């Protein structure tokens, strides 16, 4: 029963497309706007800082709460729920099994299972996005650093964290190609939240 509950809770919460709903509050179909990705960065770029912040928060929180709700069952079930939350975000039943790239939701899982790894991710992400303004690059490097941190912390679940990270990175294949080609879009995330609203 714990397996079924963890799978259901994880997928259900992860599948709630908060970024889609939040963008709709401003009359935007995020699937048909900007990059078309159902995620916080696309909401930020096209709906502004307030809506972008909401999208980021809820995409993180839904994965966090899914893991938290099965905490009493033990670490194995937390990891199952977390994995299903990320899969739910990327393949949402509410969006015909389409969704985002899973970065914010993976971050939420990291925070819920091993908070230090979440802090490592956020620190690396913030530094790289501030320096390069490449959100995709910051996200991918942040995920890898967090996974490496968990490995050196001696946690058995580092393999799951690495798998989630690699899954999200694979969903960035178009971004990776654009980074290689030198035409990946830059986004001044910090500028958005401090009133600059700068987009490159």
UniProtKB/Swiss-Prot annotation:
Mode of membrane association: Multi-pass membrane protein
**Which family is annotated?**
Belongs to the PlsY family.
**What is the predominant subcellular site recorded for this chain?**
membrane
Q: Which GO terms describe its molecular function?
A: acyl-phosphate glycerol-3-phosphate acyltransferase activity
What Enzyme Commission number does this protein have?
2.3.1.275
Which key words tag this protein in UniProt? Cell inner membrane, Cell membrane, Lipid biosynthesis, Lipid metabolism, Membrane, Phospholipid biosynthesis, Phospholipid metabolism, Transferase, Transmembrane, Transmembrane helix
Domain of life (superkingdom): Bacteria
Its BP terms in the Gene Ontology are: phospholipid biosynthetic process
Q: Where in the cell is it found?
A: Cell inner membrane
Query: Which gene underlies this protein?
Result: plsY
Give GO cellular component annotations, separated by semicolons: plasma membrane
Report which reactions are catalysed by this protein: an acyl phosphate + sn-glycerol 3-phosphate = a 1-acyl-sn-glycero-3-phosphate + phosphate
The protein's organism comes out as Thermosipho melanesiensis (strain DSM 12029 / CIP 104789 / BI429)
* Residues forming coiled coils: none
Q: How does it assemble?
A: Probably interacts with PlsX.
User: Which residue windows are transmembrane per the record?
Assistant: 3-23, 50-70, 75-95, 109-129, 134-154
What this protein is called in its record is: Glycerol-3-phosphate acyltransferase
**Function, as annotated:** Catalyzes the transfer of an acyl group from acyl-phosphate (acyl-PO(4)) to glycerol-3-phosphate (G3P) to form lysophosphatidic acid (LPA). This enzyme utilizes acyl-phosphate as fatty acyl donor, but not acyl-CoA or acyl-ACP.
What does the record give as its pathway?
Answer: Lipid metabolism; phospholipid metabolism
């Amino acid at each position: 029963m714990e397996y079924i509950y963890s799978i259901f809770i994880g997928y259900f919460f992860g599948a709630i497309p908060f970024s889609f709903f939040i963008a709709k509050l401003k009359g935007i179909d995020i699937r048909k706007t900007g990059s078309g990705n159902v995620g916080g960065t696309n909401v930020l770029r096209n709906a502004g800082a307030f809506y972008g912040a909401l999208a980021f928060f809820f995409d993180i929180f839904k994965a966090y709460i899914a893991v938290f709700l099965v905490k009493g069952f033990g670490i194995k079930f937390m990891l199952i729920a977390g994995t299903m939350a990320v899969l739910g975000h990327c393949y949402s039943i509410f969006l015909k099994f389409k969704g985002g790239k899973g970065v914010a939701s993976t971050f939420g899982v990291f925070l819920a299972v091993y908070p230090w790894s979440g802090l490592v991710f956020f620190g690396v992400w913030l530094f790289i996005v501030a320096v390069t303004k490449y959100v995709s690059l910051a996200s991918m490097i942040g995920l890898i650093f967090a996974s490496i941190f968990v490995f050196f912390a001696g946690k058995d679940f580092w393999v799951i964290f690495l798998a989630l990270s690699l899954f999200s990175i694979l969903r960035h294949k178009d971004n990776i190609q654009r980074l290689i080609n030198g035409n990946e879009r830059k986004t001044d995330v910090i500028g958005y939240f401090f009133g600059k609203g700068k987009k490159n």
